[in-house]
Amino acid sequence: MVGDPTRIVADADVLAADLLVGGNARAALDHVRRHDWLTLAASEQLLDDAESVIETLADPDLATAWRDRIGADTETVEHPPEDHPGLASAYRGEAGHLLSYDDSLRSAKTGLSIQPHADLSIRPPDAFARLFDAESLYEATHDDAYPGPDRDPRA
């Protein structure tokens, strides 16, 4: 599978950190939210995991409100229930990027096992936020000039 670099998956830890902490997780996901030509993909299982983390660390009302909002901002993908939600969402959603704090997903061993099946970059949010270049990606995937950000990431 060739991953589409305009499709991004954020693992549950990154989704929760985006809401509860901000920092690098928010900076990384703001890149996605700023551009309507980028897609945030996630499975229901992945969103369930993130909602559970938010509920545990914050409160149930915030978790429910987050889930209602993220559902509208995410393209849902399906995968077998026994699969790792973040990795499977990236694979089944044909994503080019998986953002995760999970060291085991970013290991050389995992990379070598994924490589024959998917063209997928697995990075922590700080690396994605620092290295992501919307203009060059747009120009590599579209026939016209980069129009700049077209959405408010805080809206």
Give residue spans per PLM region.
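Short, well-structured N-terminal submotif of metal-dependent ribonuclease cores
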Residues: 1-39
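PIN-domain endoribonuclease scaffold, especially VapC-family toxins
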Residues: 31-78, 148-154
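Amphipathic coiled-coil/heptad-repeat helices and related helical stalk/stem segments
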Residues: 25, 82-83
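Acidic, metal-binding active-site segment of PIN/NYN-like and related structure-specific nucleases
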Residues: 83-120
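Acidic, PIN/NYN-like endoribonuclease modules and their adjacent C-terminal/linker elements
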Residues: 106-155
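Short secondary-structure boundary segments
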Residues: 12, 44, 101-103
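Short, flexible loop segments at the rims of nucleotide/cofactor-binding pockets, characterized by
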Residues: 16-20, 74-79
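A generic structural signal for short hydrophobic patches within well-formed alpha-helices
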Residues: 15-16, 47, 105-106, 128
